[in-house]
Regions:
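Short beta-strand segments
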Residues: 38-71, 80, 87-90, 100
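Alpha-helix boundary recognition
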Residues: 35-36, 81-82, 122
Length: 151
């Protein structure tokens, strides 16, 4: 067994196969505060053959989960269908502060949970309120952190 349950081999991290079932990392108050102060992160996904892909996305929080809306025809969504493991970074150049999260992503496309998360996104982002969508039009990613590193 690995000494740190959130760590595994690089192959396991990119293959979507965990050595052990990941556990949710409870975000500390300062990590949650930092995330709430920002709205843009860089989301990293990897395909089933471990080809990495990183893109900027806007996000909001739902408790300890990170919530992101995506389009259907994106590489990140294709990757997530093959491999639910993600990493994301929120950072500031000056002062040099940041937060890196690793976690597992659930793709939500319909149903009560979708509508609940959609409401949270609409409340946070005026752009989404002005350009609304509904079930089946744009998947929502719910990312459950399993590791957090702040600097």
């Amino acid at each position: 067994m690995s000494p740190n349950p959130t760590r595994g081999s690089m192959e396991q991290a990119f293959s979507g196969r965990a050595a052990e079932p990941p556990t949710m990392a409870a975000l500390k108050a300062r990590e949650t505060k930092f995330l709430r102060e920002h709205e843009l992160c860089r989301l990293a996904t990897a395909s089933k053959d471990a080809k990495p892909h990183v893109v900027p996305v806007i996000y909001t929080l739902d408790g300890g989960d990170v919530v992101v809306a995506v389009d259907y025809k994106t590489r990140k969504l294709k990757n997530l269908r093959e491999n639910p493991r993600v990493a994301l970074v929120v950072d500031e150049y000056r002062p040099n502060r940041g937060l890196m999260l690793e976690g597992d992503c659930e793709i939500i496309e319909r149903g009560p949970e979708y509508l609940r998360l959609l409401k949270i996104l609409f409340e946070r982002f005026e752009f989404y309120r002005k350009n609304p969508w509904g079930e089946g039009e744009s998947p929502i990613l719910k990312i459950r952190p399993t590791k957090a590193v702040m600097w």
